[in-house]
Swiss-Prot record:
A single MF term (Gene Ontology): nuclease activity
Keywords in alphabetical order: Cytoplasm, Hydrolase, Nuclease, Ribosome biogenesis
Native source organism of the sequence: Ureaplasma parvum serovar 3 (strain ATCC 700970)
The protein's role, per its UniProt record: Could be a nuclease involved in processing of the 5'-end of pre-16S rRNA.
Any one GO CC term of the record: cytosol
Entry annotated with the keyword Glycoprotein: no
Descriptive protein name: Putative pre-16S rRNA nuclease
Principal subcellular localization: cytoplasm
Keyword Transcription regulation: no
PANTHER family: POLYNUCLEOTIDYL TRANSFERASE, RIBONUCLEASE H-LIKE SUPERFAMILY PROTEIN
SUPFAM superfamilies per record: Ribonuclease H-like
InterPro entries: RNaseH-like_sf, YqgF, YqgF/RNaseH-like_dom, YqgF/RNaseH-like_dom_sf
């Protein structure tokens, strides 16, 4: 089954998806929406579920904390609220697991990868959330591949 990762912000959400074996993470979309319109994000997730024939069994949500001490910040509470929305949205889908994955440094890693690939700054801005979702998903997959 596939895993879907989200790098959620207030106006954009990066999406990444795994292959059926849960080994390879690929960037899927950099979804832009009205500020804090999380119903649009839920609708996008539903669209992805349909496009992938409901082969997704896990949603991996990037979990932001303070870089140095791991304490919660404003974005952490935003993600926790969205997590509750996701749980409610998928209440009748027992097969879908929703999990957090530490996203500290994911944007830096994604940006550095893009720079190393000679991607121009304007393009980096357009795809960095999607690539951050890839980093988040890779982290999750590396820890959970045999579970």
């Amino acid at each position: 089954m596939r895993k879907l990762a989200l790098d959620l912000g207030t106006k954009s959400c990066g999406f990444a998806i795994s292959d059926l074996l849960g080994i390879i993470a690929s960037g899927l979309d950099n979804f832009i929406y009205e500020e804090n319109d999380f119903t649009a994000v839920l609708a996008k997730i539903d669209e992805i579920m349909i496009n992938y024939h409901h082969e997704i069994d896990t949603i991996v949500l990037g979990y932001p904390t303070n870089v140095y001490d791991g304490s919660k910040n404003e974005r952490t509470y935003l993600i926790e609220s969205f997590y509750a929305l996701l749980k409610q949205h998928f209440l009748n889908h027992e097969k879908i697991k929703i999990v957090y994955e530490d996203e500290r440094f994911s944007t830096k890693i994604a940006t550095q990868r893009l720079k190393n690939s000679c991607v121009k700054a304007a393009k980096i801005k357009k795809v960095k959330d999607k690539m951050s979702a890839v980093v988040i998903l890779e982290s999750y997959l590396s820890k959970n591949h045999f579970n």
